[in-house]
Amino acid sequence: MNISMHLAVAVAAAACLCVCAAAPENRLARTKQQRPTRGFKNVEMMTARGFGKRDRPHTRAEHQDSYDSHARRKFNPKSNLMVAYDFGKRSGNDDVTDEVYGLDNFWEMLEATPEREGQENDEKTLESIPLDWFVNEMLNNPDFARSVVRKFIDLNQHSFGLVRERDAEQSRFRAICGPQVH
C-alpha cells in the first residue's frame, strides 16, 4: 500500500474517534408523548363498587341465570356483625336476613324525624343513628359524605357554607345523632 492510502485510513480513524469523543456520556432517551388517561375520568367512577372479579361468580352471559343478587339489608344495631357478601370466605347464606341500612333509608328517616330541640337528652329516641356507623360511612363512602354536607350544611343549596347555616344545622344534627356528637 502506498503512503496516501495509509494517510486516508488514519484521517478516517481520527474522524471516528473525534465523533465518538463528542457524543454524550449517557444514552439519549427518546421523548415519548404522554398517553391520555383511559377509563373513567372522575374518582367516584374509578372507585365504584360492583366492578371487577368479585362482582358476581360468573361474568359470562350463559351463567347469568344462576346469579341471584343479595337483597339490601336494613341496619339493625342489635344484630350480629354485618359483613360484605362474596368476599373471601363469607357467603350470602348467612343467617342475618335484615336489610342494609342505605342512604335512601337514612334520608327518609331524617325527613320524618321531628325537631327535638326542646326535648331532654334522657329520652330514648328511635330516630337517633349509631355514631360508629355514621363515622364509618362518612370515611368510606364519599357519596354519603357529600349528601350529608348538602343536607346539613348547605341549607339554601348554593354550595357555600355560611355561619348561620352551620349553627342551625349543628343543633339539628345533635338532636338527631344524640348527645355524644360534639
Curated annotation (Swiss-Prot):
Positions bearing Phenylalanine amide: F51
Presence of keyword Signal: yes
Region (Disordered): 51-72
Propeptide: 23-37, 55-182
Cellular location(s): Secreted
Annotated protein name in UniProt: Allatotropin
Compositional bias of kind Basic and acidic residues: 52-70
Organism field: Spodoptera frugiperda (Fall armyworm)
Record keywords: Amidation, Cleavage on pair of basic residues, Neuropeptide, Secreted, Signal
